[in-house]
Amino acid sequence: MYHDLIRSELNEAADTLANFLKDDDNINAIQRAAVLLADSFKAGGKVLSCGNGGSHCDAMHFAEELTGRYRENRPGYPAIAISDVSHISCVSNDFGYDYIFSRYVEAVGREGDVLLGISTSGNSGNIIKAIEAARAKGMKVITLTGKDGGKMAGSADIEIRVPHFGYADRIQEIHIKVIHILIQLIEKEMVKA
């Protein structure tokens, strides 16, 4: 009944991944991001991650697998997803939604830490403000974006961009693959410590 639709969806997902893989800059950016994160951890730093909607879930998933585990048991790594509901509702009410991540970065971010901002459009105002706050704190910034990078293009130390201009879910599918690879590479780098 839906076999053609199912095949079409899976083929489109495979095509999006294949297009991402064609660009060696994407592979290099993933490697550089993993090394940057591991170097921060080795120096006593942490990563703060943020996103909206599905990207918020990806930010939490990233932090959870760093503090908990990915595939194998190992020590937890210092990662915080900016996802505290009381913080988000307070800042949204008192300052505005654009400040939900930046206020948290201002409060707990330190020089040597890393911000991971995830936005499929690259136009999330609250992540742009978080990047500005991270810069003011002397933090490094990694972004996972899509399409043409939006307003976030060029704002990070390392941008990993999925150049897909269709639905956001295709971009998110690559983002979660990148997140898992980042964790795998971080684990390899931390063994070298």
Curated annotation (Swiss-Prot):
Question: Where mainly found?
Answer: cytoplasm
Which sites bind substrate?
N52, G53, G54, E65, N93, D94, S119, T120, S121, S124, Q172
Residues annotated as binding Zn(2+): H61, E65, Q172, H180
The record ties this protein, via Pfam families, to:
SIS_2 (PF13580)
UniProt cofactor note: Binds 1 zinc ion per subunit.
Cofactor(s) it depends on: Zn(2+)
CDD domains in the record, alphabetically?
SIS_GmhA (cd05006)
Show the disulfide pairing: none
- Mind telling me which InterPro entries this protein's record contains? GmhA/DiaA (IPR035461), Phosphoheptose_Isoase (IPR004515), SIS_dom (IPR001347), SIS_dom_sf (IPR046348), SIS_GmhA/DiaA_subfam (IPR050099)
The GO terms this record gives for MF are: carbohydrate derivative binding; D-sedoheptulose 7-phosphate isomerase activity; zinc ion binding
EC main class here is: isomerase
Looking up HAMAP family in the UniProt record yields: GmhA (MF_00067)
Additional record remark? The reaction produces a racemic mixture of D-glycero-alpha-D-manno-heptose 7-phosphate and D-glycero-beta-D-manno-heptose 7-phosphate.
- Name of the protein: Phosphoheptose isomerase
